[in-house]
């Protein structure tokens, strides 16, 4: 607090036109006065500035943005291509198998009535001979169709080999996403000055409140070199904080 004598001296200096002496008196009074608000602001500014400098030196974020994310995009495109190729092969094989299975079913249905007559002993000799010839043809057909079915089923099985490779790729992409999430949490911590648990509450604020806060903000300084109340480089920030004793 300023004393009465100091106030009188300051008024007298101003009345006498002693501006330099008045400025020195005010400066001495200011230096001797503890300002907790200023101290707190300076401490927070220094912590934020150091955190930002450390964040700028984090080369991992640059690597992720430059290499990992494009690489992950290519991997996901590869997974899509392999999955689409396997699906097409599987559907083509099924399309080939269905007519074969239907044809076998129809042939068996044609033989079934005469076979039932044979089993009940009600078939004539001529019909029995005809049945034997039809069964012989059916066996030849079944042999060829079963070979075709086996080949198509093998094709379906081989088409599923993409799952092992694509599964590894997807797991790597998930790992990258988790790392990016962690880095974003660090960024939020730097800019909000809060613990991760407190950020959840910040992120869950109503949208209208966020819009109001953003509309009240001044925004970035576009031309700091034209303003006397702004700094334009990291060195000037360091000098400013050092001059304030932080």
Swiss-Prot record:
<keyword id="KW-0963">Cytoplasm</keyword>
<keyword id="KW-0378">Hydrolase</keyword>
<dbReference type="GO" id="GO:0009288">
    <property type="term" value="C:bacterial-type flagellum"/>
</dbReference>
<feature type="region of interest" description="Disordered">
    <location>
        <begin position="204"/>
        <end position="246"/>
    </location>
</feature>
<dbReference type="InterPro" id="IPR007439">
    <property type="entry name" value="Chemotax_Pase_CheZ"/>
</dbReference>
<dbReference type="GO" id="GO:0050920">
    <property type="term" value="P:regulation of chemotaxis"/>
</dbReference>
<keyword id="KW-0904">Protein phosphatase</keyword>
<keyword id="KW-0283">Flagellar rotation</keyword>
<keyword id="KW-0145">Chemotaxis</keyword>
<dbReference type="GO" id="GO:0006935">
    <property type="term" value="P:chemotaxis"/>
</dbReference>
<dbReference type="GO" id="GO:0005737">
    <property type="term" value="C:cytoplasm"/>
</dbReference>
<comment type="function">
    <text>Plays an important role in bacterial chemotaxis signal transduction pathway by accelerating the dephosphorylation of phosphorylated CheY (CheY-P).</text>
</comment>
<dbReference type="InterPro" id="IPR050992">
    <property type="entry name" value="CheZ_family_phosphatases"/>
</dbReference>
<dbReference type="GO" id="GO:0097588">
    <property type="term" value="P:archaeal or bacterial-type flagellum-dependent cell motility"/>
</dbReference>
<comment type="subunit">
    <text>Homodimer.</text>
</comment>
<comment type="similarity">
    <text>Belongs to the CheZ family.</text>
</comment>
<feature type="compositionally biased region" description="Basic and acidic residues">
    <location>
        <begin position="206"/>
        <end position="215"/>
    </location>
</feature>
<protein>
    <recommendedName>
        <fullName>Protein phosphatase CheZ</fullName>
        <ecNumber>3.1.3.-</ecNumber>
    </recommendedName>
</protein>
<feature type="site" description="Enhances dephosphorylation of CheY-P">
    <location>
        <position position="168"/>
    </location>
</feature>
<dbReference type="GO" id="GO:0004721">
    <property type="term" value="F:phosphoprotein phosphatase activity"/>
</dbReference>
<dbReference type="Pfam" id="PF04344">
    <property type="entry name" value="CheZ"/>
</dbReference>
């Amino acid at each position: 607090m300023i004393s009465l004598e100091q106030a009188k001296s300051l008024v007298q200096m101003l009345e006498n036109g002693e501006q330099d002496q008045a400025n020195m008196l005010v400066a001495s009074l200011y230096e001797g006065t503890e300002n907790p608000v200023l101290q707190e602001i300076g401490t927070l500014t220094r912590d934020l500035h150091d955190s930002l400098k450390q964040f700028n030196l984090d080369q991992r974020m640059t690597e992720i943005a430059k290499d990992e994310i494009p690489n992950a995009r290519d991997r996901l495109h590869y997974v899509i291509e392999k999955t689409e190729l396997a699906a097409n092969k599987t559907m083509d094989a099924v399309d080939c198998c269905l007519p074969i299975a239907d044809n076998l079913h129809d042939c068996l249905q044609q033989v079934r009535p005469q076979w039932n007559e044979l089993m009940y002993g009600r078939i004539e000799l001529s019909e029995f001979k005809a049945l034997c010839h039809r069964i012989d043809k059916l066996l030849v057909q079944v042999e060829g169709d079963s070979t075709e079915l086996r080949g198509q089923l093998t094709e379906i099985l081989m088409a599923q080999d993409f799952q092992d490779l694509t599964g590894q790729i997807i797991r790597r992409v998930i790992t990258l996403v988790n790392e990016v999430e962690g880095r974003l949490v660090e960024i939020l911590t730097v800019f909000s000055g809060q613990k991760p648990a407190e950020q959840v509450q910040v992120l869950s604020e109503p949208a209208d409140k966020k819009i109001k806060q953003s509309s009240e903000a001044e925004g970035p300084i576009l031309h700091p070199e034209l303003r006397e109340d702004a700094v334009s480089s990291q060195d000037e920030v360091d000098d400013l904080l050092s001059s304030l004793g932080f």
